[in-house]
């Protein structure tokens, strides 16, 4: 069911303050932090992670650590679409968002 949800992803950044909000019919999550500084994030699946976000090579890179594990989420614009790649333990998945009209 969750894989079929078509969420909206709203990213705002003013100076160094970043907010990412993901809204779907199933759930809405949001986190905020300062670029380059670690902060605690409560993820949609209930994990409490230590997260740091930075802009690297034109992409927004979000690195999460929890319970001895880590994952990286990279968001970049490509051909007018938001491409989100998630990597954990050398396994990657990609989700593509189209801009709302």
Swiss-Prot record:
Gene3D superfamilies noted in UniProt: 2.40.128.20
Query: Which stretches are transmembrane?
Result: none
Q: What is one GO biological process annotated to this record? A: fatty acid transport
UniProt-recorded Gene Ontology molecular function terms: fatty acid binding
Record keyword Transport present: yes
> Which UniProt keywords are given for this protein, alphabetically ordered?
Lipid-binding, Transport
An annotated GO cellular component of this protein is:
cytosol
Quote any Pfam family the record assigns: Lipocalin
User: Has UniProt tagged this entry with the keyword ATP-binding?
Assistant: no
The signal peptide here is: none
Q: Where does the record place a coiled coil?
A: none
Q: What does this protein do?
A: High specificity for fatty acids.
Q: Which PANTHER family match?
A: FATTY ACID BINDING PROTEIN
- Written domain comment of the UniProt record: Forms a beta-barrel structure that accommodates the hydrophobic ligand in its interior.
Please report which protein family the annotation says this sequence is part of: Belongs to the calycin superfamily. Fatty-acid binding protein (FABP) family.
Which protein is depicted?
Answer: Putative fatty acid-binding protein 5-like protein 3
Q: Report the source organism.
A: Homo sapiens (Human)
